[in-house]
From Swiss-Prot:
PROSITE patterns: ACTINS_1, ACTINS_2, ACTINS_ACT_LIKE. It holds the Pfam family Actin. This is Actin-2. Keywords: ATP-binding, Cytoplasm, Cytoskeleton, Hydrolase, Nucleotide-binding.
Amino acid sequence: MADEDTAALVIDNGSGMCKAGFAGDDAPRAVFPSIVGRPRHQGVMVGMGQKDSYVGDEAQSKRGILTLKYPIEHGIVTNWDDMEKIWHHTFYNELRVAPEEHPVLLTEAPLNPKANREKMTQIMFETFNCPAMYVAIQAVLSLYASGRTTGVVLDSGDGVTHTVPIYEGYALPHAILRLDLAGRDLTDHLVKIMTERGYNFTTTAEREIARDIKEKLCYVALDFEQEMITSTSSAILERSYELPDGQLITIGNERFRCPEALFQPGFLGLEATGIHETTYNSIMKCDVDIRKDLYSNTVLSGGSTMFQGIAERMQREISSLAPTTVKIRIAAPPERKYSVWIGGSILASLSTFQQMWISKVEYEEIGPSIVHRKCF
C-alpha cells in the first residue's frame, strides 16, 4: 500500500461506472454509477435539506423521484458541469482527499476528440488545483493488469468498445478500431425486446432496472440459431426477475438476444462489424509477423465482457475467421470489470512513470495542449 498522504489517485471515468482509488492498491476504493440525478418533483417539506442534484449511489437510491443523466456518452464527456460534480463527489465524498495534494491519473477511450482530454486537463489543474495529472488509454491499462506486454485488448464498457493491438509495449495506433456499441446500447436493446412481452421501461429510473436484468440474467449463446430453436421448443431458458415492487416478470430468449447484438450489430440497426470481426480486423491491420502473438493473446476487459459464455463464443468466431493453423487464446481474467483501474494503479505506482506526469508548472507554461505531447 502506497503512502496515502501523497499517493497518486487513479480515476477510471467510465460511461457507466466511475472507479476510483489510490495507486498501489489492488482494487478501487470507490465504485459508483456515473450518474447525476435531479428531482423531477416539487419539494414540499421544509427543512428536509433537499439538494438540487445527487451523484452516484445516492442518485441511484433516490432514482424513483429523480431524472437521471449520464454526463459521459460513448466515452466522451457531453456535460462538463455534471462531470465536475462527479469528480468533486469522487474526491471529497468517496475518497475523502484534497485533490491539490495528489497527482491524478485519468483514463480515456482511444480515438476520442482531442478537445475532450484538453478540457479534462484544464478542469483538473484549474478547478481542482492538482499538482500533476496524466491521461492514459483504457485498453493499454488493461494489458498492464493482465501482466502482458503484447496482445490485442477488446475493451467493452458501457459507452464504447475498442480493440487495441499492443506489441512489446507499443500501441499500434493505425490498427486501433473503435465501435460505439456497448453496454448502454445493449440495455436499450433489452428494453425494446422486453416490450414484446408487454413490459414497459420508460423512465430513466426504470432503465436502471433493465440494466440490472441485463447484468444478472443475460448470457451469450455459443450458437445463436440453435439457442433460438431451443427457446421456442421449451421453457428451459426462462428465468423470472423480481421488480422493486415485488412483481415477478419472466424473461426467456431475451436473455441471449440482448448481448447477441455485440456479435450482430445489425440487431440495433447499426452498420458495423461485430466484436469478433472488429478484433480480427484489428489484428489484420498489423504486420504479418506479429499477428500470431496477437491471436494467442486476446484479452477481454470491461463490464460488457462479463456475460457468461462470451469468451467461448469469441474463441469460436475468431477461429472461423483466422487461418486454421493459428493458435487462438482468449484471456478473460475474472477481475476484468476493473482491469482498467488495476492497470492504472500499477502504472501510477511505477518509479519509471514518475517523470511522465504533467506538472502544474508545465501546464501553466504551455496550456491544455500539453496533454497531447506528454500522453500517448
